[in-house]
Swiss-Prot record:
<dbReference type="Pfam" id="PF03483">
    <property type="entry name" value="B3_4"/>
</dbReference>
<keyword id="KW-0694">RNA-binding</keyword>
<keyword id="KW-0963">Cytoplasm</keyword>
<feature type="binding site">
    <location>
        <position position="463"/>
    </location>
    <ligand>
        <name>Mg(2+)</name>
    </ligand>
</feature>
<feature type="binding site">
    <location>
        <position position="464"/>
    </location>
    <ligand>
        <name>Mg(2+)</name>
    </ligand>
</feature>
<feature type="binding site">
    <location>
        <position position="460"/>
    </location>
    <ligand>
        <name>Mg(2+)</name>
    </ligand>
</feature>
<keyword id="KW-0479">Metal-binding</keyword>
<dbReference type="InterPro" id="IPR005121">
    <property type="entry name" value="Fdx_antiC-bd"/>
</dbReference>
<dbReference type="InterPro" id="IPR012340">
    <property type="entry name" value="NA-bd_OB-fold"/>
</dbReference>
<dbReference type="InterPro" id="IPR041616">
    <property type="entry name" value="PheRS_beta_core"/>
</dbReference>
<feature type="domain" description="B5">
    <location>
        <begin position="400"/>
        <end position="476"/>
    </location>
</feature>
<dbReference type="InterPro" id="IPR009061">
    <property type="entry name" value="DNA-bd_dom_put_sf"/>
</dbReference>
<feature type="domain" description="tRNA-binding">
    <location>
        <begin position="39"/>
        <end position="147"/>
    </location>
</feature>
<comment type="subunit">
    <text>Tetramer of two alpha and two beta subunits.</text>
</comment>
<keyword id="KW-0648">Protein biosynthesis</keyword>
<dbReference type="InterPro" id="IPR005147">
    <property type="entry name" value="tRNA_synthase_B5-dom"/>
</dbReference>
<keyword id="KW-0460">Magnesium</keyword>
Amino acid sequence: MKFSEQWLRGWVSPQVSRDELVARLSMAGLEVDSVTPAAGDFSGVVVGEVLSTEQHPDADKLRVCQVSNGSETFQVVCGAPNVRPGLKVPFAMIGAQLPGDFKIKKAKLRGVESNGMLCSQAELQIGEGNDGLMELPVDAPVGEDVRTYLSLDDASIEVDLTPNRGDCLSLAGMAREVGALYAAKVQRPEVPAIPAAHDEVRPVEVLAPAACPRYLGRVVRNVDLSKPTPLWMVERLRRADVRSIDAAVDITNYVMLELGQPLHAFDLAEINGGIRVRMAEEGEKLVLLDGQEVTLRSDTLVIADHTRALAIAGVMGGEHSGVTANTRDVFLESAFFDQIAVAGKARSYGLHTDASHRYERGVDWQLAREAMERATGLLLEITGGDAGPIIETLSEQHLPSVAPVTLRAERITQMLGMEIDGLEVERLLTALGLTVTADGAGQWRVEVPSHRFDISLEVDLIEELARLYGYNRLPVRYPQARLAPQAKAEAEGDLPALRRLLVARGYQEAITYSFIDPKLFELFNPGVEPLLLANPISADMAVMRSSLWPGLVKALQHNLNRQQDRVRMFESGLRFVGQLEGLKQQPMLAGVVCGSRLPEGWAQGRDGVDFFDVKADVEAVLGFAGALDAFTFVPGKHPALHPGQTARIERDGREVGFLGAIHPELAKNLGLDRPVYVFELVLSEVAQGRLPKFHELSRFPEVRRDLALLADRDVAASSVLDVIRENAGEWLTDLRLFDVYQGKGIDPHRKSLAVGLTWQHPSRTLNDDEVNSTTQNILTSLEQRLNATLRK
């Protein structure tokens, strides 16, 4: 919500500075996002009148003007296309200071003397108009300072409202809050009822009363929309970031900003018969005011006449029924549309309007008539015309209602950590428009007004008290409770410790969205039906992720595009597998790695990370809870991974994750020009460990044997190690694969595996005969089962 400070102070004016007001609003939960001046920093600019113009003798696009400041006449050379006799414009006289530290001096343009400058909006930083001079009203007093005339010593305050505070999406709502914060009186403008000057009405039929419980319409005849919108209204709209269009549209926008009630003006000549508020027919077409043609769905509420749809209710009007400069009769609409009926409709059609923004957050249903009278009065004042009677339809059973809320003093003390005097409680709540009745026993019965849709519980009232009293004034009271640590199996690992482990291995934690682009989902999961969101934030966040990889890879792209060549990230979060029926939400731990193996340094190379580097990180995670030997890595297939660099991770035969390099085709589609490795693990399987078994350290020496084995190239090293373990006996304490070789001196169909075996007995020294016998058993089993022999 953006508004002019001067406009706000016209409603309520606490005796505080702008800075204090802004700080107080933010502390009350209405966070001020920005404060911007209404105009640039300039001085010496007055209202000037162009008395005459003539062509510059040496320049086709320049004109020599005689300009009056009310007491003197000055010659000014100007190249603006709209300069003409009788025009009143901002006139920067000699010595004037313009934004950008630009000082006006006497000058010669193509040999003709110029004593000042006629200014555009952009040159004074009053809006963005740079296509000509800023035209002031014909009644602007010549010679008056422009800053004074336009009240430019003002600022636009932008408040970032939370979705539950739709009541503050208007100047009336903001004034109500400021009045409550400072115990200041709010001067709400009187809105008199406009008497009917004729009896013409258009019948209104509401066919969807649950979606539109209240609808008001009024015919206003003989308006002149060629008349300009008054400068004071244009300026208030500009300072609220609303562009002036024409008198009718400006008035409806102004009333919406002022009171919070969206309105719409139809060209009466384009309405066939009466008004029907109905649900759209499936496939019905409508060209909107922005020129976009939309195909309506049957769940969309529309305003229609007897032949076609005229507008999407609460979102945007249609082009063919919109008002133009030629419109002579208008039909004003002021309605209350249910939040649920409007919610998400604008986004579903790729739209976002001020009206939909308000209806989605809630509009006070009691505002409709006041807003209609206010808009009618302004329309008659600015454009002339004759107003007819208001026609209204009302479905009371579908209007929102809030039951009274009981507030207890005891509960206030409990939640805020302090007591608030009963009279102060009543004063604060009454200032917000709530009706408070005390029962004399430390309780109040509070009736909630129709504009506060966010108050329905006792805690909501206590929140209001805390806001108005001041969060910074609440005492610091530490909670006192008997807390018992949560019981947890000793063998179970915890996520924070796993995070610390990965950070220690050079990873950084990432947090990505659970909803992703459908195209990205298809790239990682071709042929899989995604879980679609009914009301997505945007089109590229429309499906739930079935893996953490898409978000991590997108984060990787973001970093690579910013010259971060070495990226190691992990994330823990939920993945969503299946559809709504039988949906599985599974906690996962995933990572992405790209770049060099080690950080840049003089003592280490710049070798790129490879599959086995990432596998080592995964093994560290799997072994964290003491159960590494329960996991196995087997060759696997995954549509997102390289067919030759993919490992499926299993635990007791169950699939618990994947590790591998991004598939080359996927990398190409994602614009990745370097190897990228990813892993993803089921968190519950990783965390499930084993209790360590402690035993006395042996005082006797270890015995080590290194074996160089020749095996077929397609034999997995893990198979060789499994056979060795089975035959190495109970005193084997360590088994390591420390070299793999293929090349000169080796059969091209074979490979050499070098393994180290270590034995140690807890109570005696092992002799060579025992170790040699065991080694021979190992070699015999390897040859029989895997055709693996000792290299000679």
